[in-house]
Amino acid sequence: MLFSRPGRSIFPLLPPYGAHDPNGGRRIIPLNPDGITPYLGLRSRLSQVWLNRWTILLLLVLARVLIAVAGMQSDMGSAKREALSACTSVESMGSAMVSMPHYLSQGVNELTAAGVEKAVSALKTMLLLTITGVEELILFFIKVMYQTYLCLFTMVVRGSVHLALGVVEDAADFLNSTVKSIGQDIHKSVDSFESSLNSFIDDINGIASALLGEIPKLDISDKLDKLDSLSLPSSIDSTIDKVNNSIPTFDEVDKYVTNILRTPFEEVKRLVNGSLSNYTFDRSALPVPAKEQLSFCDGSDGINSFFDKVAHITTTARTIFIAVLIIAAVLVCVPVGWQEIRRWRTMKERSQLVHKDAHDPMDVVYIVSRPYTAATGVKAASRFSNSRRQILVRWVIAYATSPPALFVLCLALAGLFSCLCQYILLKAVERTVPELTSEVGQFAGKVVDKLQDTSAKWAADANSAIADTNTDLNKNIFGWVNTSTTAVNDTLDAFVEKTTGVLNDTFGDTVLSGPVQEVYDCLIGLKVEAVQKALTWVHDHAHIDFPLLPNDTFSRGAADSISDGSSNPSDSFLADADDQTSNKITEVVFRVTDKIEEGIRTETVISAVILLVWVVNALIGVLRALSLFWSRERTRGEGGGGAPMPAAPADSHGFVDVPLTAIPDVASHSQPAPRYEGPAPALAVSRDIPYGDEKLGSVGQKALHVDGISDLRGSSYVEYGMEKR
């Protein structure tokens, strides 16, 4: 589209070198004048290489990193003071902890003594009940045994005696009655025979008495009278009655055994009551540890060495950042200088486009002023065959890489790079925190070790007192139990011996001695033997053993709080109840690192937002281009496409009119900028209006009178129809 404007005084785009040539002829404008120029030459440009954006950004990053390092050093200095203060607090707390046995032992000693006294009191009651129960059980058992077997013995012996007496009486009665009857019959027969014989003798005596003398008479009646009085001796009945009357009643055994058994038990109960009724544990035998004072902060290089190492890291990092960034800022001048040389050469080459009428002068100015972004746009546009789309692609790239947009992008990248440098420094510091944690852990270990030593010493002394109590009770109480069990065993032996003696005295010379002894061994002897074995077991196991105090009575909780198995870091005795770290000292360092990390995070977010602004700006250009990319191009009849700019010859003042054309020449791909189709026919241009006076400045030129040309310039935008982009 052509714009008609009245003539006005303007500063020409291309200064008319030699416009006041005294010869009045038209001169060729030099592309690289050797004299003084109003624009910067190559040497002038190279003299400002160190002011390039990358060097400035790197120096800004360096300044931000140095500020961060200084802030970290200041924060670490404060953290060191707080850590030393916390160490002093931990030292005081550790001293209080290792002195806790001094205070706790008094209560624990009282608890231990009271526990022993209550145990002894319960032991006394239990012993008395046990002794009484065992006493009665043994007596009951023995009485049941010998009274049961007494009944058995009585039944057997008395039954046998009664049977024998009956048999003897029957035999005596039978013998007495039978012998007398036989004696009487014999007596009668003998008397008859004797009478006859005596008569016969009398007759003989009468005849032969003169010759032989007198024959004696037969007299056996006296002998027969003895037969009449024949009977069994009465001693048989008396012997059997003696056996019957001599069966033992075990009254003596009962009385003897009862007295013997009750004597040791009653003696034991008397001794137990006398010894344990007023038993009091000797509390003075339990020790009370002395107070302790720890001092591991003074003269300890743990905290100082940690913060010295952190200071060394920050100093080293600062030196490295200064060296690297300054070297990078200096080295970046080399490619920037080389870039300026190439840009200068490219500008000289492309400045010739101003003399050609096939190029849009604004495009030429853009290509010359922004060679790299313009070249990128040209390369990206070469993928499209449509000139409209080629121009849109170049426009998008130009929109996204405009100086304001590039400033925003570079600012965002510089901020992100600064955050990266600070993050590297932060991680270098955080890697040293475990060393401080280890050192603080050693502090806790020192406290626990001291506490364990105190606890172990106290436990050893207390256990010694408890062991003495065990020995005393075992000697004075269970010694009596051992004595009583031995006495009971002796009593049972006496019982067995006495019972066996009674049985031997009773049945020793009778046929019942063997069976009675066997019955006794089977029914009583085996039971007594079992009881003796039980009493022997009681004798071997009757002793008291109070549990001893562990060596870590006062240190177990502290040791568990710093052990690896502790799942909650706030359980550490070096931490407060609401702390999330294992101790106060490392919490100070973590607070500093968290603060720095929060600052880095904030700066990262700000840089990301700035980068997002550039992305949004680029997306706006992309969306605008896409809206035109797919829309149909309007024809001239629809209001699109202005008339071609006519070629204007140079005027008498030496200005060169560059015609504006809008249609590219797709056949020209070797040019640094797209060519447009052939020039339109020349149009007569009125130059009646003179140029206004304009002072050129310090170049020493005179004021130029330039005639305004109404059709010299059109719109400064790339035009498609009536649209401007």
From Swiss-Prot:
The keyword GTP-binding does not apply. It is found in: Cell membrane. GO terms for biological process: plasma membrane fusion involved in cytogamy. Residues 75-136, 340-394, 624-725 are cytoplasmic. The chain crosses the membrane at residues 54-74, 137-157, 319-339, 395-417, 603-623. It is a multi-pass membrane protein. It comes from the Eukaryota. Glycans are attached at N176, N244, N273, N278, N482, N489, N504, N551. The keyword Chaperone does not apply. Disulfide bonds: none annotated. One of its GO terms (cellular component) is plasma membrane. Keywords: Cell membrane, Conjugation, Glycoprotein, Membrane, Transmembrane, Transmembrane helix. Residues 1-53, 158-318, 418-602 are extracellular. Its main location: membrane. Involved in cell fusion during mating by stabilizing the plasma membrane fusion event. Belongs to the PRM1 family. This is Plasma membrane fusion protein prm1.
